[in-house]
Amino acid sequence: MKHTLSVLVQDEAGVLSRISGLFARRGFNIASLAVGPAEQIGVSRITMVVQGDNRTIEQLTKQLYKLVNILNVQDVTNIPSVERELMLIKIQVNSQNRIEALEIVKIFRANVVDIAEDLIIVEVTGDPGKIVAIEQLLTKFGIIEIARTGKISLVRTSKINTEYLKDKVVAYNA
């Protein structure tokens, strides 16, 4: 099972290197990684997605706490949270299919950030499922390049699960 870990660290040189070294020694692959400043000055948030069962992730968490500069480790996999990714995707278009490509972009509430006669660069943000879905639909146009961030995540203050919210929005709009 994939787990999303949110790790708060002191923003100092070598922290990410020590974390990646721990993962390498244990034979873990980091499927997704995003690092950036947290809400507190001098603290960074690392959001990573790793594969493993609950016991393995618990052991990994204990090992992370043993590293210098680790302030907090939280497995947010089963906690209601907001998850987002960003993808830039450059696709091949022509006069016959440009409108269809732009309609897909519009449906996904994505943005065209660059356009040329035969190429479009699209920026899309959303949960990982949305990113995968638009990528699959745009594949038929010919993908030239993709740049995709790792997943970022914050625990919901409301503690309400996203799936619950989707059901309520659908019922409300019906």
UniProtKB/Swiss-Prot annotation:
Main location class: plastid
Location of the ACT domain: 4-78
Name of the protein this chain belongs to: Acetolactate synthase small subunit
One annotated GO biological process: isoleucine biosynthetic process
Subunit structure: Dimer of large and small chains.
Enzyme Commission identifier(s): 2.2.1.6
Encoding gene (name): ilvH
Keyword annotations from UniProtKB, A to Z: Amino-acid biosynthesis, Branched-chain amino acid biosynthesis, Chloroplast, Plastid, Transferase
Reactions it catalyzes: 2 pyruvate + H(+) = (2S)-2-acetolactate + CO2
Keyword DNA-binding: no
